[in-house]
Amino acid sequence: MSKKDYYDLLEVGRNASIDEIKKAYKKLALRYHPDRNPGNQEAEEKFKEVTAAYEVLSDSEKRAGYDRYGHEGASGGFQGFSSAGDFSDIFNDFFGGGFGGGASRSRAKRSTTGVSGADLRYDLEITLEDAFKGIQAPIHYVTNVKCDTCQGTGGEGAIKPVQCHTCQGSGRIRTQQGFFTIERTCTTCYGEGEIIQNKCKKCGGSGRRRDEVNISVSIPKGIEEGAKVRISGKGEAGTKGGKSGDLYVYVKIIFHKIFARNKADLHCKVPIRMTLAVLGGEIDIQSIDGAKIKVKVPEGTQTGTKLRCREKGMPYMNSHARGDLYVQVIVETLNPKNLTKKQIELLKALEEEENASVQQQSEGFFSKVKKK
């Protein structure tokens, strides 16, 4: 290591207080720490230098010797770390062991808490009639399920994993390079802290396997487009004893040829005869549940008029109430090619009557104008 000035390395003056030295070291240590600069040899060397400077300048006796005699006065420079623990004690004063993956000096056993499986999505198409009455929908999908041979342990004969002998269960390996301690992922257990001695032949040691799942999903009546139904525990299987994820079934309602839906209300269009529109009467239509209902058509109904049928729409979710059905009337015009002789005669008579009525109205209008 080059003999650089310790004060310059920490970017402080020679009269700096111990608090200023600590603050400067913390800033530089964070900047150059190997965990923040993986593979950067220059940063690693810089980290070693600022740590060596701090070890001397934070000790009043070593600092006094350094100020008077230079590096020789500080007992040969950076000699203070006789074990891997010495470096950790200094660095943990600042960061609480926040770097290096968290394995403690006592090599505490790595937590083997299970990992939950992923949630899954399934898109289900149903008819409007299905949404009206509610159904039990059979679905099937392929996902990772718990291996039934090893019961999810990954070991042959359902034998559970054992603690890794290389890292003693921590999942991390610490090596001492002079005064500097480097911590890396254990290459034996790949950071798991445990190993499977004899892997299950069916799942290859993963504890899971790909398989088809067949279940029945309850779709409640009144469900709307885009709504989702959650089935707990039917997602991807977890690992290391972790719980399975959930399955979310998203509902898509197929386009209906007759009814359009707006929440719990239904809308439809019904053609009626011109005479019915003029004289009024009743029409029979079929509702979404297949029942026939009578709809009253008032006299003088115009095209586009909406007739409301109360509580003949879709059911509300988790309720016995229903929305309304709106029937939009389309008044049909007469097709001259399909008229009978009698119908033509009646229309001519109607035309003569209308002309006479118009003539009387015109004469009355002009007589009023003349009087003025």
Curated annotation (Swiss-Prot):
Keywords: Chaperone, Cytoplasm, DNA replication, Metal-binding, Repeat, Stress response, Zinc, Zinc-finger. PROSITE patterns: DNAJ_1 (PS00636), DNAJ_2 (PS50076), ZF_CR (PS51188). Residues 5-70 form the J domain. It comes from Wolbachia pipientis wMel. Participates actively in the response to hyperosmotic and heat shock by preventing the aggregation of stress-denatured proteins and by disaggregating proteins, also in an autonomous, DnaK-independent fashion. Unfolded proteins bind initially to DnaJ; upon interaction with the DnaJ-bound protein, DnaK hydrolyzes its bound ATP, resulting in the formation of a stable complex. GrpE releases ADP from DnaK; ATP binding to DnaK triggers the release of the substrate protein, thus completing the reaction cycle. This is Chaperone protein DnaJ. Its cofactor is Zn(2+). GO terms for molecular function: ATP binding; heat shock protein binding; unfolded protein binding; zinc ion binding. A zinc finger (CR-type) spans 134-212. GO terms for cellular component: cytoplasm. Binds 2 Zn(2+) ions per monomer. CXXCXGXG motif repeats lie at residues 147-154, 164-171, 186-193, 200-207.
